[in-house]
Amino acid sequence: NIFVEEAMRGIRDTGGRGARYYTTDICDGIAQGHDGINYSLAHRDMIANMIEIHGNSTGFDGGVFIASCDKSVPACLMGLARLDLPSIVITGGVMDAGPDLLTLEQIGMYSAMRQRGEITEEKFTYYKQNACPSCGACSFMGTASTMQVMAEALGLMLPGSALMPATCKDLKDMAYQAGKQIMELAKMGLKASDIVTMKSFENAIMVHAAISGSTNS
């Protein structure tokens, strides 16, 4: 909501008026290991559908799309492509790492070590409680972080805004600047299809290779 308010303020300060629409997002990490993962792509498509429905049922001149995680970022990209309006994506940033660069990615390894008796239950509990120390997308180059980079590489985010730490104060200013910039894009009539071209896809593919991005992307 902080970023929504900042984006709205940027729109207001540039002479526009925005409207807020929300949709829910599931966590692929929590959904793994049981039937919940079968909802992953379905919920991505539902988010994209709702973006299309809200966008086309109302006379918007542009859109700021806020998402951070595995399927919500691609859902926004799919939705804004269908709308083909002036569009900017901003993200909620990336989670801080835990002690000794501990991340959620390592919990599976520690779980196996606990089952083999190589670490104590106490140590395993410590890892679980400290792997996700803040809000934000998972702090490793998984699908969420990769998709943030891909959105910027495609030209749909402000330069330098992908992978900013979720606890970084600059993120608020980035959201505000996105609100101001969407007004400029709307005045120019610069649509998503004017930015996302074959060349921008080729650029994103090269960037993906350069960062060793998630193959899920």
Model-assigned labels for residue ranges:
Residues I2-A42:
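Anionic-ligand anchoring segments at beta-strand to alpha-helix junctions in alpha/beta enzyme folds, i.e.
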Residues S40-N203:
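Active-site cavity-forming subdomains of large catalytic enzyme subunits
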Residues I205-V207:
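Flexible, glycine-rich loop/tail regions that form catalytic "lids" or insertion modules at the edges
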Residues S212:
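Active-site-proximal helix/loop microenvironment
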